[in-house]
Amino acid sequence: MDLEEKLARLPDHPGVYIMHDANGAIIYVGKAASLRNRVRSYFRGQHQPRTQAMVSHVADFEYILTDNEVEALILECNLIKQHRPRYNVSLKDDKSYPYIKITTQEDFPRIQITRSVTRDGSRYFGPYTSAGSLKETLKLLRGLFPIRTCRDTPLQPRSRPCLNAHIGRCLAPCAGQVDRETYREAVDNVIMFLEGRHTALVKELKEQMEAAAARLEFEKAARLRDQLRAVQEVCEKQKLAAASGEDADAIAFAREGEAALGLIFFSRGGKVIGRDHFFLTGSEGLSRGEVMAALLKEYYSRGVEIPPEILLHDEPEDAATIASWLSRLRGGRVNLRVPKRGTKLKLLRLVHENAVSLLQEHLLTRRRQEEGSRAALLELQEILELPRLPRRMEAYDISNFQGSSQVGAMAVFVDGRPLPSAYRRFQIKTVRGPNDFASLQEVLSRRFRRAAEQDPHFADLPDFVLIDGGLGQLHAARETMEAMGVGYIPTFGLAKEEELLFRVGTSEPIRLPRESKALQILQHLRDEVHRFAITYHRQKREKTAYRSVLDDIPGVGPKRKKALLRHFGSVAAISKATLEDLLAVEGMNRTVAARILAGLGRRSDGEDSTGSP
């Protein structure tokens, strides 16, 4: 079915539309009160340059019907999180204040401090502009609710609990001293506390305490009683602090050309406690209302705290739908307001002035960085007699540990700056044993073969190639590139420690001055690819270390393996289990249980099948 026919068949119904390019990649996700009117509008009449560029890449589209606009907005946000489409507005953190993070996606969630809010399923609370207030909050939380703070992911079973468990600050799920349901109750209580739902929390704690007492679980009831008293004390203090003000976020943004910056002031108890800002990508050509709507959806879908009132410098598109969505996320009413007078208008003007100032400062810094990078590239071109300015530079490195799990990495700089989205990593497939030269040749042959095959991830060829190593690695690289018919690309090797630069055709190294901007950019590129390779290699080692004999048993996938380890605690304990013990594990059947026994050298009748006495 061609696009015209699909457009003609669009329903007049709320939903989400998904635009695909010729490669099938998702390039834009949007929501609409009427899919028919909204999607057809892209292919009718004139649009802003960015929208026209997006439409020119649309080869196909699909849509999902929803009951109403709020449901469409929720689905739109989830799909944007999942696919990160090229033409949707996105926020890029420059810096942020610390948040409290609760890893709710884990079986036994942890509480942590973090400065980055990512889409990992965790809940985030904050930001905290005062280190003192953050420490006080954490101290209070750890005293009230004993949930774990360790870094184990996944949770590693232990025979004995840690010190925190002995002093009553952890329920010790690692030692099997608490079940998931009880632990989740504690986590839910923490979330209610951080959300400020103190009345609901007091009620919940009372009910849990009374239920524990009715079951004659007096130790648990006493712990809940102490938590209840502490929460009630905190509530009384906060009532006094909150009596003079209210909680709100104040949001504005500034734009200049393609650059845009969003700024949020956090007002708690009637006082501005801090701010956070984000750079907006993909906002050019959009109206101010569209940008504000995108900013709200992107920021609050991250799992951050949502106050009861959000003050806005510009009226967002679909304000009523966004307010309903935010209210659903918060679990209470959220008001979106564009003040016209009074102190709240003054606050928003201040936020906007700050946004303009921050954007100007950012643009000035970026211009200076671009000028510095260009000067370094010009110096590099002159010193090395390069045929053209090395705008795209690629570096390659090989990493291995005692000859095992060799990996390769490619880092990319464009105009002297890192371009992480273009970084690539390679698992070495054809080389056995430690052989950096052969591994490097495999990586380069795969990279340039992909370019010849028009793979969009490798389509852009470099103006300059840097190899982490000396003459040996350099010759291996050039040999491969010539065999691939790549053509002339200036290729150099940068040796560590003495920082000598090698080129093909001479054994005499080039020694650049230590203060040289050209050397500094090469060092940065070399160090970046080395870091990327080491990180990938470490991840592979950790993944290999977590493997066990269970991974080789048919029918035991990640989910079943997790259930087995949760039930028994370790592979050693599983090896002592009987068929009946295994069948007690959630999701287990007799066939797989028998395979596990066989894989562990046991028979289903309980006898050892190894033939040992």
Swiss-Prot record:
Residue intervals of the UVR domain: 199-234
Assigned keywords, A-Z: Cytoplasm, DNA damage, DNA excision, DNA repair, Excision nuclease, SOS response
Localization in the cell: Cytoplasm
Main location: cytoplasm
Coiled coil: none
A Pfam family hit: HHH_5
GO molecular function: DNA binding; excinuclease ABC activity
Signal peptide location: none
UniProt keyword Cytoplasm present: yes
GO biological process: nucleotide-excision repair; SOS response
CDD domains noted in UniProt: GIY-YIG_UvrC_Cho
Positions of disulphide bridges: none
CC terms in the record's Gene Ontology section: cytoplasm; excinuclease repair complex
Every GIY-YIG domain range: 12-89
Subunit structure: Interacts with UvrB in an incision complex.
Stated role: The UvrABC repair system catalyzes the recognition and processing of DNA lesions. UvrC both incises the 5' and 3' sides of the lesion. The N-terminal half is responsible for the 3' incision and the C-terminal half is responsible for the 5' incision.
Listed NCBIfam families: PRK00558.1-5, uvrC
Family according to the record: Belongs to the UvrC family.
Name of protein: UvrABC system protein C
